Each structure stands twice: as structure tokens, then as C-alpha cells.
């Protein structure tokens, strides 16, 4: 892998997807234009797209493990402008709303725990 892309990826992960593109470029020892071009060539995505995916995965993981999490609190914690911004981005990447995903996660967790109890009792 290109060391510039590796440094950029590390900076984006370290910043949980909230690091501005200009700071990612600085960490990668590149200009913004060069970094954007390399990202697009290697992955087909922009730096901003990848940052958005990093944040989306954090929201998804939080909601999977804690379906009752407060969306406004998550939005603030993960650097979204507001809850509506979080919801739009979540739907963009997953095709569903964060609230619907959380409800589904809660149902699945309940089903898994019931299956486990039935397995242990058998």
C-alpha cells in the first residue's frame, strides 16, 4: 500500500472520521489535491466519503451494542452537526434510518438471548 495512503488512513482512524481533509493531507505529507487524487484512483472514493464511512461504522456499532442509545448524544459525540445530519448519513450508507436499525438490533439481541436460553435448557 502507498505509504501516503497508509498515513492518511491512520490519521482518519485516529480522528474517528472527523479530521478535516486538510489535516489528513498534512498527516499524509501531501497536498489536499494529491491526496484526493490518490484516494480516488486507489478506491474510487473521496477522503470525505471514507471519513463518512468511518463515522457511520461507529454509529452502527454503537447502535448494535446499545440499541437504546440517544441519537442526539451520538451525533454530538461522533462529530455530526446534529441528529438530522447523523440520520441522513446513516441512511445514505445503510438504506435505513438509525432508529429502524436500533429497533432491529434490539429484536435480534432479544431473539439471540432467547435462543441461548433455550439451548442451555435443552
Region spans (language model):
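Generic alpha-helical hydrophobic packing signal
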Residues: 22-25, 30, 58, 62, ...
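…primarily DNA-binding HTH/wHTH and HhH modules…
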Residues: 64, 89-122
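Residue-level detector of family-conserved "landmark" positions at structurally sensitive sites
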Residues: 50, 85, 101-103
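DNA-binding recognition helix and immediately preceding turn/loop
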Residues: 3-49, 67-78
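Short hydrophobic clusters on alpha-helical segments that form packing/core surfaces
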Residues: 8, 12, 39, 43, ...
Amino acid at each position: 500500500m502507498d505509504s501516503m495512503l497508509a498515513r492518511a488512513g491512520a490519521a482518519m482512524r485516529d480522528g474517528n472520521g472527523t479530521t478535516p481533509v486538510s489535516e489528513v493531507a498534512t498527516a499524509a505529507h501531501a497536498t489536499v489535491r494529491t491526496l484526493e487524487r490518490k484516494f480516488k484512483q486507489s478506491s474510487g472514493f473521496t477522503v470525505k466519503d471514507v471519513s463518512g464511512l468511518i463515522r457511520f461504522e461507529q454509529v452502527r456499532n454503537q447502535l448494535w451494542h446499545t440499541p437504546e442509545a440517544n441519537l442526539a448524544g451520538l451525533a454530538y459525540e461522533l462529530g455530526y452537526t446534529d441528529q438530522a445530519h447523523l440520520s441522513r448519513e446513516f441512511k445514505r450508507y445503510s438504506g435505513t434510518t438509525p432508529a429502524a436499525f436500533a429497533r432491529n438490533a434490539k429484536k435480534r439481541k432479544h431473539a439471540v438471548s432467547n435462543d441461548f436460553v433455550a439451548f442451555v435448557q435443552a
